[in-house]
Amino acid sequence: MKEAIDQFIQQKQLSKNSRLAYTYDLEQFLEQVGTINDTSLRLYQSSLQSLKLSVQKRKLSAVNQFLYFLYNQKYIEHYYKLNIPKDQKENSSQGSLLDLSVFWQESQVPQGRLIALLILENGLLPSEILSIKVADIQLDFQILSVEKAGQKRIVQLSSKLTEELSRMASGTYLFEKKGKPYSRQWAFRQLEAFLSEKGQAGLSAQSLREQYILRQLKDKRSLHDIARDLGLKSITTLEKYR
């Protein structure tokens, strides 16, 4: 399994110090857990609780990225993800605009990256994203047709997001396997892996959707306009942003 560490690190563009840190943390992880399963992972996470929170977060972030790599490369049969503890500062960031420009950087989880961008840029729900067909995307006009509860709405796409979609739009659905859309569980795994890779494991589909709303409010858009773009029938769920 240790050879997988070298393969994993070779895929990432890291400084010398970062490579050494990843190698140390992951070798220590493998030595401690032995066989990777739910029990060994819980014991590993418990062993970190005496460390500073910043050290815990660094180690757990590296391990989560490595676990996704192992699953993706079929070293392990199941996908595992360790919970990264939140500190008070992180919790207080709820309701505040975050700098998530790192999402536009290249990723080892391209599908998770695109899911994150569709939520952040257009406030789409994972279920809406999974139902997107390639035919719903009109690249020339930079628009996307989204269906929710039998109702369709048109979503305007940014130039950057249009370019991203043009690279991955093939087949019947935007995200598919053998002509059928992936499950929501798959989408959440992809999103979690991407967020972990970018050091944003504390975020979720819901918090990314909130970031979309906050960005729209910053641009002086009304709650009624935002509700319409999100496919909501009223502004009831947006009242807290008044």
Curated annotation (Swiss-Prot):
Q: Which Gene3D superfamilies match?
A: 1.10.150.130, Intergrase catalytic core (1.10.443.10)
Coiled-coil features, chain-numbered ranges: none
The cellular location(s) given in this protein's UniProt record come to: Cytoplasm
Q: What is this protein called?
A: Tyrosine recombinase XerD-like
Q: Name one GO biological process term.
A: DNA transposition
What are the record keywords, sorted?
A: Cytoplasm, DNA integration, DNA recombination, DNA-binding
* Domain Tyr recombinase: from-to ranges: 90-242
Natural source organism: Streptococcus gordonii (strain Challis / ATCC 35105 / BCRC 15272 / CH1 / DL1 / V288)
In this protein, which residues make up the domain named Core-binding (CB)?
Answer: 1-71
Q: Which family does it belong to?
A: Belongs to the 'phage' integrase family. XerD-like subfamily.
Q: Name one Pfam family in it.
A: Phage_integrase
As for what it does, the entry says: Putative tyrosine recombinase. Not involved in the cutting and rejoining of the recombining DNA molecules on dif(SL) site.
A GO term for molecular function: DNA binding
Its taxonomic placement starts with: Bacteria, Bacillati, Bacillota, Bacilli, Lactobacillales
Q: Which GO terms describe its cellular component?
A: cytoplasm
Q: What HAMAP family does the record tag this protein with? A: Recomb_XerD_like
Question: In which domain of life is the source organism classified?
Answer: Bacteria
